[in-house]
């Protein structure tokens, strides 16, 4: 069993955890005694965590499932919101958009070619681009969050786990849904409207042979930020997504599914930052410091504060054929293309002329990328006591980067510059290439009626290189200070698990898993050997799952040993992507769904994480530190709490449904809590503990296809930041949205 220790844990946090464990232990001391007369039953949940459809009860993996109904009750409209209802998951970090950290595992995402260590899948297709974290949940059927290394079956970059998103499928029954929402952000100085429309339709084109589905989502949000330069509104969102699917089933054994997705965000402002210190580039200007007040910014850019453009297109083709008495062979092919552009106001001056002769300094960045994926997967039938899965996988990704800082002199009238259009300034550009192949297999053997052994492994062969770093527009030439030779990496990720089914309602499992992640090149900082070498993780996990007529519960205890953790480190002047030698993590997670009656349901989740860096010396950035001055040139981070790894986090959702003569009235309230979070490993930038409260009231008239809802998000108007863009001279947080209240109308047909 993993050994647990608590370093400097807060008394209240430990007390909360002990209290929660005690309560749940008491409740489950006799699981079958939970069944109550009059309590509504809980439906079985199917997942594909082991690449075949199975009951979540039978899978020896820690999984949290959010169904479409769960998302509606919690008013979750953004993929990042699921961190409030999934134990051990937090959307935060050093990216302006926030990226998932599962059990404290997250890498720095600084530029093209850097991929998050939590694998994101949409309809079975891996999503390498980090902008998928801005995905709106318009046509989602289910989200499965798999925790712990998932490399054996899900492949590359699943060190922390995998988030598997399933969207609505084509059906042979004509049906659809339209949802209209309007909300107002009332917690900032700018009352901002937020309008969205989602529509979904499916039905047959040829009965029992050909079916379609189509979903469209559009959102238009006024900015809730105040630009201190002129008092104007900033931070608007304008985006849409269209998804089309075509299902052809020429026979009972064969199915072909074609999917097309188009997404675009215009003037989508992802950066809403304020400096945390006075030792910044902005100190050159008396009126040029970013505001310290949340939801206030300062920018002399036209078109908003840090305007951003995102466009993506993807295509996927899945062909499945069932061989009678043997199994199913599936071919999955996909192609995706992304284009991301945004401008950062580096000087942030409030003066129209940037206090000449100092320049207006704006930084335009572009991240074009495309990827190709091909997988062949065979899923066997049950042969006596044995079943197995085997497959091969190919992945190719080209991730570009171009940056333009302009102008170097204050040549533009009015003090405004557009880095994209400027002909004067510092220009850099590069492309990172990744090519990966893998072969994998997993076998399940029933040792007895109650005990099942799972054994699997994945062999990975990967190559990554970068080229084309350029100065003053000289492209296609590898910079002399960069080693552009390919970095090759091979690994084998094994998995061993035992699942003991004590009864239909109670099971236990233990697993040992190893995960790996290949080298990562950063194309941003322009330094020699600017890449992080491969990282490795070994995990031991012990868990239990219990189900009954009116409850579902899971608990897991885990211990991680992390080697060569890829992270942002300091070289004494600026940040680079490198490796922290080692880290350790231990924790416990709980997930409980319980129906007290036909009218009342409770969902409680909790996670406790003890994490620390191992022995690692690192340089300290020059200049005054944001919160913790360190005059030393070199420090050892050994024993420090890892970043994006709160010790305690928990959430509670209560849903009460009243069945009235005229219809159904549903009231739902939820709260989520997170302990302190550090945003980089020198522990300079921290967000103190915070609690967020959401609520909704909905009414569905009898004999009607309409549901009307009132909702409130962040009702306490909690001011906390979820991301921090770090620099030795300018640490800038990105705050969460303020309080929002609104109304929604759903119509199903």
Predicted regions and their residues:
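Structural signature of Gram-negative outer-membrane beta-barrels, strongest in the C-terminal barrel
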Residues: 247-251, 378-381, 385-387, 393-395, ...
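Outer-membrane beta-barrel domain signature, strongest for Gram-negative TonB-dependent receptors
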Residues: 231, 237-388, 395-397, 552-554
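Conserved C-terminal beta-signal and adjacent last beta-strands/turns
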Residues: 202, 369-391, 538-540, 640-749
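Surface-exposed extracellular loop regions of Gram-negative outer-membrane beta-barrel proteins
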Residues: 266-277, 396-400, 486, 499-541, ...
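Membrane-embedded beta-barrel scaffold of Gram-negative outer-membrane proteins
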Residues: 198, 316-346, 501-517, 533-601, ...
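Gram-negative outer-membrane beta-barrel transporters
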Residues: 388-389, 446-453, 559-561, 579-681, ...
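Outer-membrane beta-barrel translocator/receptor signature
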Residues: 116-117, 129, 138-141, 152-227, ...
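Acidic, small-polar-rich N-terminal luminal/periplasmic segments of exported/outer-membrane proteins
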Residues: 40-173, 187, 542
């Amino acid at each position: 069993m993993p050994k647990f220790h608590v370093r400097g844990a807060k008394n209240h946090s430990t007390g909360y955890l002990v209290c929660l464990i005690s309560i749940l232990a008491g409740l489950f001391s006799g699981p079958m005694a939970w069944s109550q007369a009059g309590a509504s039953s809980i439906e079985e949940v199917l997942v594909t965590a082991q690449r075949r459809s199975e009951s979540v009860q039978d899978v020896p993996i820690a999984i949290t499932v959010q169904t479409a109904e769960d998302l509606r009750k919690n008013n979750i409209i953004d993929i990042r919101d699921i961190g409030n209802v999934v134990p051990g998951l937090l959307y935060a970090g050093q990216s302006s958009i926030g990226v998932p950290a599962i059990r404290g595992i997250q890498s720095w995402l600084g530029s093209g070619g850097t991929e998050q260590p939590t694998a994101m899948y949409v309809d079975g297709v891996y999503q390498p681009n980090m902008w998928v974290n801005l995905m709106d949940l318009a046509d989602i059927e289910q989200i499965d969050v798999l925790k712990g290394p998932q490399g054996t079956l899900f492949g590359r970059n699943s060190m922390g786990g995998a988030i598997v998103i399933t969207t609505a499928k084509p059906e042979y029954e004509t049906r659809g849904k339209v949802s209209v929402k309007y909300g107002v952000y009332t917690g900032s100085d700018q009352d901002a409207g937020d309008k969205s429309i989602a529509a979904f339709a499916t039905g047959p084109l040829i009965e029992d042979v050909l079916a379609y589905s189509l979903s469209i989502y559009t959102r238009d949000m006024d900015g809730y930020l105040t630009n201190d330069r002129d008092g104007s509104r900033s931070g608007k969102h304008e985006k849409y997504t269209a998804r089309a699917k075509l299902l052809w089933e020429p026979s009972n054994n064969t199915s072909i599914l074609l999917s097309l997705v188009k997404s675009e965000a215009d003037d989508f402002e992802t950066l809403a930052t304020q400096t945390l210190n006075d030792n910044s580039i902005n100190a050159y200007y008396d009126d040029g410091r970013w505001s310290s007040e949340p939801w206030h910014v300062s920018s002399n850019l036209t078109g908003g504060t840090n305007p951003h453009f995102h466009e993506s297109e993807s295509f996927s083709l899945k062909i499945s054929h069932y061989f009678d008495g043997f199994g199913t062979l599936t071919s999955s092919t996909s192609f995706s293309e992304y284009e991301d552009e945004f401008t950062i106001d580096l000087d942030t001056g409030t003066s129209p002329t940037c206090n000449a002769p100092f320049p207006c300094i704006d930084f335009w960045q572009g991240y074009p990328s495309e990827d190709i994926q091909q997988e062949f997967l065979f899923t066997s039938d049950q042969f006596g006591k044995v079943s197995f899965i085997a497959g091969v996988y190919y992945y190719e990704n080209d991730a570009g980067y171009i940056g333009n800082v302009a102008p170097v002199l204050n040549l533009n009238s009015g003090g405004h510059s557009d880095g994209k259009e400027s002909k004067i300034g510092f220009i850099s550009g590069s492309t990172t290439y990744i090519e990966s192949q893998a072969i994998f297999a997993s076998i399940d053997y029933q040792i007895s009626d109650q005990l099942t052994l799972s054994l699997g492994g994945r062999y990975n062969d990967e190559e990554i290189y970068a080229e084309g770093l350029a100065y003053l527009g000289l492209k296609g030439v590898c910079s002399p200070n960069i080693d552009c030779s390919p970095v090759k990496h091979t690994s084998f990720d094994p998995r061993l698990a035992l699942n003991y089914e004590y009864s239909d309602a109670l099971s236990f499992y233990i697993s040992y898993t190893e995960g790996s992640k290949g080298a990562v090149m950063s194309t941003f900082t322009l330094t020699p050997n600017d890449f992080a070498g491969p990282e490795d993780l070994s995990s031991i996990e012990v868990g239990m799952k219990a189900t009954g007529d009116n409850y579902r519960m899971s608990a897991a205890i885990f211990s991680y040993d992390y080697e060569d953790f890829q992270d942002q480190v300091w070289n004494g002047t600026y940040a680079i992507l490198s490796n922290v030698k080692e880290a350790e993590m231990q924790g416990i997670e709980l997930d409980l769904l319980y129906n007290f009656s036909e009218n009342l349901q409770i969902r409680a989740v909790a996670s406790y994480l003890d994490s620390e860096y191992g022995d690692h010396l690192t340089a300290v950035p020059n200049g005054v530190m944001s919160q913790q001055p360190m005059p030393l040139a070199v420090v050892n981070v050994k024993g420090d709490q890892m970043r994006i790894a709160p010790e305690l986090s928990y959430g509670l959702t209560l849903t009460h449904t009243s069945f009235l003569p005229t219809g159904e009235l549903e009231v739902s309230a939820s709260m989520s809590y997170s302990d302190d979070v550090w945003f980089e490993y020198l522990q300079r930038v921290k967000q103190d503990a915070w609690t967020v409260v959401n609520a909704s009231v909905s009414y569905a008239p009898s004999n009607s296809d309409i549901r009307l809802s009132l909702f409130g998000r962040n009702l306490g108007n909690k001011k906390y930041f979820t991301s921090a863009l770090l620099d030795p001279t300018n640490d800038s947080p990105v705050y969460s949205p303020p309080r929002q209240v609104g109304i929604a109308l759903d119509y199903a047909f």
